[in-house]
Design a protein with these regions (language model features):
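N-terminal glycine/threonine-rich, aromatic-flanked beta-hairpin/loop signature
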Residues: 64-157
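Bacterial Sec-dependent N-terminal signal peptides
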Residues: 16-56
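Edge beta-strand at a domain terminus
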Residues: 157-202
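Sec-dependent bacterial lipoprotein signal peptides
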Residues: 1-19
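N-terminal secretory signal sequences
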Residues: 27-31, 54-57, 69-71, 156-174
Length: 202
């Protein structure tokens, strides 16, 4: 009887420990389901979003950052286009993101991180605001340029759902003085035009 009790107690302890260990994890099937939903939406909206919703910012750009009234950097490449598989994509540096939603009239897009994203961003969503492209005050002799701002939450990560990213308040964001402030307390990023179509993909 004592042996049976000990075995039962041991099994309960292991079960409790296993459940505690799993309590902070995401169900793999649910994560995959969310990703599939996002990718299907991205694929469905690929042509429409890229060719219409992103009409004024499509192309390849040099990526810089503004602070204290000056924009510098412009060493990494930003591509906003449609990749060979038909998805709308936003790529910059080593980052590669699927564009899920965009609006050329409201000047925003939402992209989804890949499942391999780090810093707690796997499968999450981020909203990007941009300004109307201009043909003056563009660094490095570029023919046109625009400012953009990444809208993050208080943890500086993406949003868990598409609705969260879509409905996040942007009333505190302003492009009135993008070289100095207006993007979460910082200056905006700036993109200077290189070409209409990307020549290679990550």
């Amino acid at each position: 009887m004592k042996t049976t009790f000990k075995i039962t107690l041991t099994m309960l302890v292991f079960a409790f420990a296993f459940n505690c260990n799993q309590s902070g994890t995401v169900d793999k099937s649910k994560a995959n389901e969310n990703l599939v939903i996002g990718l299907v939406a991205g694929n469905t909206n690929g042509s429409t979003s890229v060719l219409t919703g992103l009409a004024e910012v499509r192309g390849v750009w040099k990526d810089g950052f503004c602070s204290g009234g000056t924009c510098t950097g412009f060493s990494s490449t930003l591509s906003i286009a449609q990749d060979p598989t038909g998805f709308g994509v936003w790529t910059t540096g080593s980052g590669y993101y699927r564009i899920i939603e965009s609006s050329n009239t409201e000047r925003y897009l939402i992209y989804q991180y890949l499942p391999t994203a780090t810093f707690g961003n796997a499968n999450k969503y981020t909203k990007i605001l941009w300004t109307q492209p201009q043909t003056t005050d563009c660094e490095n002799g570029a023919s046109k340029c625009f400012y953009y701002c990444t809208v993050l939450n208080s943890s500086f990560t993406g949003y868990s759902t598409l609705d969260e990213a879509r409905n996040v308040s942007t009333t505190s964001y302003s492009s009135t003085n993008p070289k100095t402030t207006g993007c979460g307390g910082f200056g905006w990023s700036k993109a200077t035009f290189l070409s209409s179509n990307p020549t290679s993909w990550p």
